[in-house]
Amino acid sequence: MPTIQQLIRHGRSMKASKTASPALEKCPQKRGVCTRVYTTTPKKPNSALRKVARVRLSNKIEVTAYIPGEGHNLQEHSIVLIRGGRVKDLPGVRYHIVRGSLDTSGVADRKQSRSKYGAKVPKAGAAPAKKK
C-alpha cells in the first residue's frame, strides 16, 4: 500500500485495456487479400466444417477470418473486407468477412437478417416467406 506522499509523487497508473481485434488497429473494417480458403472443424461438443480464410490485410498483418452464411465465392487472391468479431467454437478466429462487399458476394436466397449477409431485397413476384 503506497503512502499518501508516494501517491502525490506518482499517482495511480491506469491499467491498459487490451483490444479483442488488434489487427484492425482501431479501424472499423480493413481490406485484405485471401491467401488461403479452407474449412476447419470446431471445438467440442460442436461438429461441422466451418469455412474460414487466411487473409493478409493492407497493414501486412495476416489473420484468420470466418466466412459467414451458406455458400461463398471466395478463392485465393480475392479482395475482402474484414470486421471484428470472434467465432466462439473456432480457436484463433477473431475476425469476420463482410458479405456483399468487394469480391465477396452476398448470400443467395436469404430472406431474414439480409443486411448482415449482403443479400438484396427479394423480388415482389417471389413467394413470401411462410410464417409459423
Swiss-Prot record:
One of its GO terms (biological process) is translation. Residues 102-132 are annotated as: Disordered. Residues 118-132 have a biased composition (Low complexity). InterPro entries: NA-bd_OB-fold, Ribosomal_uS12, Ribosomal_uS12_bac. Keywords: Methylation, Ribonucleoprotein, Ribosomal protein, RNA-binding, rRNA-binding, tRNA-binding. One of its GO terms (cellular component) is small ribosomal subunit. Transmembrane segments: none annotated. CDD domains: Ribosomal_S12. This is Small ribosomal subunit protein uS12. It comes from Chlorobaculum tepidum (strain ATCC 49652 / DSM 12025 / NBRC 103806 / TLS).
